[in-house]
Amino acid sequence: MKKINKIKIKLNGKYIKIQDRITLFNLTKKFKVPINKVAIELNQVIVNKKSLDKIKVKKNDKIEIVHFIGGG
């Protein structure tokens, strides 16, 4: 059986361990994030949602997921 390597990242200010080389898209699926209602920042750069399945998370990355909240 193949061992899954884990890496440490910072997600919304908290350190977590996740599968190495996971894409941002799969990370959002893992945490049930509604990608149409959030902005995702990777190492202080806003990520284009069309790129989520192409960008692989790396060790020590800092990811912020910000939810949009409507108001009036």
Model region roles, listed by residue range:
Residues 1-71:
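Ubiquitin-like/PB1-type beta-grasp interaction modules and other compact soluble beta-rich domains
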